[in-house]
Regions:
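Conserved "HGTGT" condensation-loop signature of ketosynthase/thiolase-family condensing enzymes
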Residues: 4-79, 97-101, 112-125
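Active-site-proximal alpha-helical scaffold in enzymes
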Residues: 83-113
Length: 125
């Protein structure tokens, strides 16, 4: 599938983003809810309209369960994606391909990290 085919089959209907910075008061789940509900509002949909989701997060040994719990997305497939610095892009790409293939109409691609809470400041170079 070339990029022009993808452009004709997939549309971004909403987006949400949390404030970047030190968010000591918010958990990763809080950030997921904040971004997702902003995206739902922007798209004019509700969480129940989402048919599948992709969660991008690095270093978490859990599956898509945190996203399902935080957003009450019961009984839909949620795939956790991890691809180092390209994790969010990979989650987005997989969600786009699922829509382009005609498997789903409305999907959610979401990525979250809370590096400061884990006391990890990055890799030394």
């Amino acid at each position: 599938m070339c990029s022009s085919d993808l452009r004709d089959r997939v549309a971004i209907i909403g987006m949400g983003c949390t404030k970047f910075g030190e968010r000591w008061d918010a958990s990763a789940s809080d950030l997921m809810v904040e971004a997702a509900y902003e995206a739902f509002s922007d798209a004019g949909i509700e969480g129940k309209d989402v048919q599948a989701a992709w969660l991008g997060t690095v270093g978490s040994f859990r599956t898509g369960q945190p996203l399902a719990e935080a957003l009450k997305l019961d009984y839909i497939p949620i795939s956790r994606v991890e691809n180092a610095c390209a994790t969010a892009t990979d989650a987005f790409r997989n969600a786009c391909y699922a829509v382009a293939a005609g498997i789903y109409d409305i999907v959610l691609a979401l990525a979250v990290e809370k590096l400061k809470d884990s006391r990890f400041s990055g890799f030394a170079i």
